Amino acid sequence: MRKQRSPWTKKQQFIFGIIEIVVTLIASLTAILIVATKPYVDAEKKVIAIAESKADIKTVTEFDIYHGEATYYGLLGKSGQGEKLAVIVSHDSGEVDIYKQSDGISKSVAKKAAKAYGAKDISYVHLGKYGKTPIWEVKSGTQYYLVDFISGQVIKVEGL
C-alpha cells in the first residue's frame, strides 16, 4: 500500500488557512461598517434632498445630526445664488428652518464661546435646535455647551 502524498505541505496549508481567516474578517468588518453607517447615509441623502428643494441648496459643505430634546439634522451649504445657508430639519415633524450663515455665528465662534465657559478639548460642534432656538452644540469631555446660533451666547451647559 502506498501512502498518498497531499499536494499541499503543512506550511502551505497553514498559510492558506491564515489567508482565509484574514479575508473572512475583512469581508465581515466591511459588511458591519456598511450596515452600521446606512442610517446616517440615508438621513444625509434625505436631508440634502429636502434642502435642495426647500432652500435651493446646490453645494453641501457639512451635515450633522443633533440629538438633544429632539433629533435635528443640520446642514451647511451654498444656494444657487452663492449665498451661504444653514438648514435645520426636524427628524420628527420634518419642519425646515433656513438661516443665512451671515445672520448667525460660525462654528469657530461657537467654540470660543464654549471655551469662555470652561470647555477644554472640544470633540465636535453640531448644528441643531433647542426649543425654537437654532444652536451649535459644542461637546467637550462630558459637557455639552448649547450656543445660540444667532447671538453667540451660551444658553445651556449640560453633562456631568
Task: Locate predicted features.
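N-terminal Lys/Arg-rich, disordered targeting/topogenic segments
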Residues: M1-T9
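Hydrophobic alpha-helical segments and their boundary regions
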Residues: S6, F16-G17, G141
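Residue-identity detector for threonine
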Residues: T9, T24, T30, T37, ...
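Hydrophobic membrane-insertion alpha-helices, especially the h-region
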Residues: I15-I32
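Short, non-transmembrane alpha-helical segments in secretory-pathway proteins
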Residues: T30-F63, D97-Y130
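Conserved histidines in hydrophobic membrane contexts and catalytic metal-binding motifs
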Residues: A51, G68-G94, S108-L160
